[in-house]
């Protein structure tokens, strides 16, 4: 059974930082590209970026969060990370990790991030 479990969310002040984690199991993590997406309250799902696998150099692609957010992975532990810096109120959302980069057949339940003073 494929499982993805996000953690690390919470309340943070504007300008602050958070690191989200996504623990995975049930598939060969090293084989897959992995993505982060988010859904702000009452809004549509927004793709943030992805990281390729080792075979493709662990290279990354980002949306408009490039420069503030960094995706990384630990293949030995099967964990995906999202480092978020200089957070803004508009970054408040539920954040999800997903396997692959287009058809998100597998993703987690999400972790809520609230950016507020």
From Swiss-Prot:
InterPro entries: Ig-like_dom, Ig-like_dom_sf, Ig-like_fold, Ig_sub, Ig_V-set, IgHV
Disulfide topology: none
Species whose genome carries this gene: Mus musculus (Mouse)
Statement: the UniProt record of this protein carries the keyword Transferase: no
Protein known as: Ig heavy chain V region MOPC 47A
Recorded GO CC terms: extracellular region; immunoglobulin complex
Gene Ontology terms, MF aspect: antigen binding
Ranges for domain Ig-like: 1-113
Keywords carried by this UniProt record: Adaptive immunity, Immunity, Immunoglobulin
SUPFAM superfamilies: Immunoglobulin (SSF48726)
Note, other: This alpha chain was isolated from a myeloma protein that contains one light and one heavy chain per molecule, linked by a disulfide bond. In contrast, normal mouse IgA molecules contain two light and two heavy chains and lack a light-heavy chain disulfide bond.
């Amino acid at each position: 059974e494929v499982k993805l479990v996000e953690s690390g969310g919470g309340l943070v002040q504007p300008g602050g930082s958070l690191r989200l984690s996504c623990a995975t199991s049930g598939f060969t993590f090293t084989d897959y590209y992995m993505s982060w997406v988010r859904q702000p309250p009452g809004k549509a799902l927004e793709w943030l970026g992805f990281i390729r696998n080792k075979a493709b150099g662990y290279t990354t692609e980002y949306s408009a969060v490039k420069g503030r957010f960094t995706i990384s992975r630990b293949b030995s532990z099967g964990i995906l990370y999202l480092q978020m810096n200089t957070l803004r109120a508009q970054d408040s959302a539920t954040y999800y990790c997903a396997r692959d980069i287009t058809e998100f057949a597998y993703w987690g339940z999400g972790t809520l991030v609230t950016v507020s003073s």
